[in-house]
Amino acid sequence: MKFIVKLYPEIMMKSKPVRMRFTKMLETNIRNVLKKVDEDAKVQRQWDRIWVKVPNDKPELAQAFGERLACIPGIAHVVQVDEYSFTSVDDIYQQVLPVYRDQIAGKTFCVRVKRTGSHDFNSIEVERYVGGGLNQFTDAIGVRLKNPEVTVNLEIEGDKLYMVTKRIEGLGGFPMATQEDVLSLISGGFDSGVSSYQFIKKGARTHYCFFNLGGAQHEIGVKQVAYHLWKTYGESHKVKFVSVPFEPVVAEILEKIDNGQMGVVLKRMMMRTAARIAERMGIQAIVTGESLGQVSSQTLTNLNVIDRCTDMLILRPLIAMDKQDIINECRRIGTEDFAKSMPEYCGVISQKPTVKAVLAKVEAEETKFSEDLIDRIVEQAVVIDIREIAEQMNTRITETETVVAIDTNEVVIDIRAPEEEENKPLEIEGVEIKRIPFFKLATQFADLDKQKTYLLYCERGVMSKLQALYLIEQGYHNVKVYRP
């Protein structure tokens, strides 16, 4: 069994050297991701496609491979195929007939063929011959070229016939690391998750910068969002997570800054700090989730004033998106439930925030800050490899027990994603198992029986530890991590 990976059309339009570079990078990215599923995964690049072979002795990996390929930037779509050899057009028909006989019975159908290589026939001739045979020697209702109930998709390359058994839509965009790195300001809400995702999809290695306005609970939640985005869409490359202790800045704003200017000043301080951090990391652009007119600091006038605080390029991919469209995209990429349960820290709220800030007035207010404030904040920032989140959580989960055995009155919660849980169902004799995906746990845990203890389970133990710490920070102490 094989997958044929089709390149995103924008890649196909590039010049030959650029197209070759992009295709090589996509091949490497696919290999990096699939090797984590199975070491025997085979990936082979051609000019206009990439082949992925599922090991013959492990057909059950097909679903896992397909799910991972669907989340790798740079792919238009993927087709899962079964491979056959043929000697003639009639031989093609004879091999297609037993496969599709039952599938097209009582239905309309059509045959579509894509062909590469030198043959004594063309694609249309194969479509007519195979379609005519299926129409005559099966119980199909007939051929319908527009909107058929079943489409028989065939691909021919040399003397090989590939019958398409499944088509999987890809992300599109460019392969990861074909564009330069960016630093995304992430709060864990609806907007910042989507803006981060859009740059991952565009092929930029996206690092994360979190401004902690107070509370370990918020930082844990944001790390879950960042880890989910990286693990799902950007796992082929290492990225950094930067946590900036911003409480001192908030304290000085509340104490020294004019009430109406607080929101704009806070954003300018964030941009200055992020720019300094980005420069240290060799990054030339900052990404934010700001959308025009969404809040008072996001008017054109205020955004212009905010941008004047640094020479660093500030990118706002959501600038013209409606809030509902952002939420819909958030739901599609799997961060909606995180955003819904994210704690809000509104320490800097102006009574009458200005929507038309004056640069000179804002700069005058900023002279009231301590001279070394930004320097201190940047020095205190904690930078970690996003893959180290699990190890970091291990040192912090002092209130949470990790268990290998299950006692009475304990319930196991399988927090894996639905596809992963379906692939490898967790079954423990005599034990109650609830299935709540990690991205829904924060909103559903409060409804569970508080008299019972809950053991969180996931494959590698990373997300279960994050979720356990998050729940403990919310005040739940009837939770442990299950590692059989």
UniProtKB/Swiss-Prot annotation:
Keywords: ATP-binding, Cytoplasm, Disulfide bond, Nucleotide-binding, Redox-active center, RNA-binding, Thiamine biosynthesis, Transferase, tRNA-binding. It comes from the Bacteria. One of its GO terms (molecular function) is CCA tRNA nucleotidyltransferase activity. It is an enzyme of class 2 (transferase). Residues 406-484 form the Rhodanese domain. Pfam families: Rhodanese, ThiI, ThiI_fer, THUMP. GO terms for cellular component: cytosol. ATP binds at residues 185-186, 267, 289, 298. Residues 63-167 form the THUMP domain. One of its GO terms (biological process) is thiazole biosynthetic process. Gene3D superfamilies: 3.30.2130.30, HUPs, Rhodanese-like domain. Its EC number is 2.8.1.4. It is found in: Cytoplasm. Disulfide bonds join 346-458. It catalyses: [ThiI sulfur-carrier protein]-S-sulfanyl-L-cysteine + a uridine in tRNA + 2 reduced [2Fe-2S]-[ferredoxin] + ATP + H(+) = [ThiI sulfur-carrier protein]-L-cysteine + a 4-thiouridine in tRNA + 2 oxidized [2Fe-2S]-[ferredoxin] + AMP + diphosphate; [ThiS sulfur-carrier protein]-C-terminal Gly-Gly-AMP + S-sulfanyl-L-cysteinyl-[cysteine desulfurase] + AH2 = [ThiS sulfur-carrier protein]-C-terminal-Gly-aminoethanethioate + L-cysteinyl-[cysteine desulfurase] + A + AMP + 2 H(+). The active site is at residue 458. Pathway: Cofactor biosynthesis; thiamine diphosphate biosynthesis. InterPro entries: Rhodanese-like_dom, Rhodanese-like_dom_sf, Rossmann-like_a/b/a_fold, ThiI_AANH, ThiI_fer, ThiI_N, THII_Thiazole_biosynth_dom, THUMP_dom. Belongs to the ThiI family. PANTHER family: TRNA SULFURTRANSFERASE. Catalyzes the ATP-dependent transfer of a sulfur to tRNA to produce 4-thiouridine in position 8 of tRNAs, which functions as a near-UV photosensor. Also catalyzes the transfer of sulfur to the sulfur carrier protein ThiS, forming ThiS-thiocarboxylate. This is a step in the synthesis of thiazole, in the thiamine biosynthesis pathway. The sulfur is donated as persulfide by IscS. HAMAP family: ThiI. This is tRNA sulfurtransferase. It comes from Shewanella sp. (strain MR-4). The lineage of its organism: Bacteria, Pseudomonadati, Pseudomonadota, Gammaproteobacteria, Alteromonadales.
